[in-house]
UniProtKB/Swiss-Prot annotation:
Its EC number is 4.1.1.112. GO terms for biological process: oxaloacetate metabolic process; propionate catabolic process, 2-methylcitrate cycle; pyruvate biosynthetic process. There is nearly no change in activity from pH 5 to 10. This is Oxaloacetate decarboxylase. Mg(2+) binds at residue 88. The keyword Lyase applies.
Amino acid sequence: MHRASHHELRAMFRALLDSSRCYHTASVFDPMSARIAADLGFECGILGGSVASLQVLAAPDFALITLSEFVEQATRIGRVARLPVIADADHGYGNALNVMRTVVELERAGIAALTIEDTLLPAQFGRKSTDLICVEEGVGKIRAALEARVDPALTIIARTNAELIDVDAVIQRTLAYQEAGADGICLVGVRDFAHLEAIAEHLHIPLMLVTYGNPQLRDDARLARLGVRVVVNGHAAYFAAIKATYDCLREERGAVASDLTASELSKKYTFPEEYQAWARDYMEVKE
């Protein structure tokens, strides 16, 4: 069986972006899940930052995973992947220079595309966890990412959160990233089609949409007409794996089946309340 090179996988992803269809990603988190996704016919996969944190650290999504840890997991996937994989590279693990290092390492790992977001990460002392960096810094990160890539087929996608700012600010940011040379725009927090249309009409590069299964956005044909080429519904496969592991081990110990959901199990074993308490204790301004 022919195993596509990393460049060929990147070209395959570019072809998806150049098409007139809308594709749904498979959540891939290790080599086995990547092989399964390809065998089932998924056109592309995504290694989510939150999922990588769970898989590598058993920690909640508090930007705790390091670039090296993330790249190691991406490399394991890249060794076997027969489908293009997008890396959720969070904020690029630092400033624009860190973004350049991130691109170099993920390109070497075999990733087909990566997203760089403009959220202020990791959370800063005395700042809201939902703050965004300024547009100018976001543009600098995208320009740095483009400069750092060696294979021109590697897709650089600028990501922003449409839920945290008004639509005019979203348009301003996405236009700036488009002008900076981003190959695509990733939108999180889009409410419905009216919200999406207000943003999409200003853009001429492909869109990637993180919907988390939002029922207001379940129309692939309409999404495609608006320029959406990639949809991320979430990471249900990973959480199903957690649930299956828990239920299997409980049964081996002779326990009855549990009614805990996958989401509840994730919280049970990643201790988010502890991290939140530490953040309040060490990172908030005391009155």
